[in-house]
């Protein structure tokens, strides 16, 4: 346990940021699952709206440093391939 006042404050800040990051990562997983469900149901319109939501959320998470920008790009690319296969 930290004894220095600034170290104690850093522990509180880290806990807060960790919770926020967990919430955002959990929301990302939920958005991806919604897209996957729409894709499995072969629902084109719902898949398009879900993809837009996922894409925006991934970009925001990458810009805030919660996930790496390459991971966001890879996820978006793979989901876009699925969406395009549904349209074809």
Curated annotation (Swiss-Prot):
Gene3D superfamilies: Ribosomal protein S20
Stored Pfam families: Ribosomal_S20p
Keyword RNA-binding included in the entry's annotation: yes
Family indicated by similarity: Belongs to the bacterial ribosomal protein bS20 family.
Alphabetized UniProt keyword annotations: Ribonucleoprotein, Ribosomal protein, RNA-binding, rRNA-binding
General function of this protein: Binds directly to 16S ribosomal RNA.
Entry annotated with the keyword Plastid: no
Gene Ontology CC terms: cytosol; small ribosomal subunit
One GO term of the biological process aspect: translation
Protein name stated in the entry: Small ribosomal subunit protein bS20
PANTHER family: 30S RIBOSOMAL PROTEIN S20, SMALL RIBOSOMAL SUBUNIT PROTEIN BS20C
Originating organism: Clostridium acetobutylicum (strain ATCC 824 / DSM 792 / JCM 1419 / IAM 19013 / LMG 5710 / NBRC 13948 / NRRL B-527 / VKM B-1787 / 2291 / W)
A molecular-function term among this protein's GO annotations: small ribosomal subunit rRNA binding
Gene name tied to this protein: rpsT
Lineage, opening ranks: Bacteria, Bacillati, Bacillota, Clostridia, Eubacteriales
InterPro entries the UniProt entry points to: Ribosomal_bS20 (IPR002583), Ribosomal_bS20_sf (IPR036510)
């Amino acid at each position: 346990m930290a004894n220095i006042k600034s170290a104690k404050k850093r522990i509180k800040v880290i806990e807060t940021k960790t919770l926020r990051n967990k919430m955002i990562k959990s929301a990302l997983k939920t958005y991806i699952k919604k897209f996957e469900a729409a894709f499995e149901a072969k629902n084109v319109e719902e898949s398009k709206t879900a993809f837009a939501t996922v894409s925006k959320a991934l970009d925001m998470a990458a810009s805030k440093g919660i996930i790496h920008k390459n991971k966001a790009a890879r996820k978006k690319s793979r989901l876009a391939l699925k969406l395009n296969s549904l349209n074809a």
